[in-house]
Amino acid sequence: MIKWIIILLIVAAAASLLGMPALAGAAATGARILIGIVLVIFLLVVLGIFAVT
């Protein structure tokens, strides 16, 4: 999932540099959503609620 976050951030940066604000915003929003999901899963693992084996 971290791989997708990095890809989306690179796409957002490239689109922004090329003058495509809609694509940049969509990619940044996707990355932001994935970052939120990763943080929630991380907190659940740290608190021991969600065990990864």
Curated annotation (Swiss-Prot):
The species this protein was found in: Mesorhizobium japonicum (strain LMG 29417 / CECT 9101 / MAFF 303099)
A single Gene Ontology CC term: plasma membrane
Name the record gives this protein: UPF0391 membrane protein msr4317
Stretches that traverse the bilayer: 4-24, 33-53
Protein's membrane topology: Multi-pass membrane protein
UniProt key word Protease: no
Family: Belongs to the UPF0391 family.
InterPro entries: DUF1328
Location within or outside the cell: Cell membrane
Keywords on record: Cell membrane, Membrane, Transmembrane, Transmembrane helix
HAMAP family listed in its UniProt record: UPF0391 (MF_01361)
Location (main, coarse): membrane
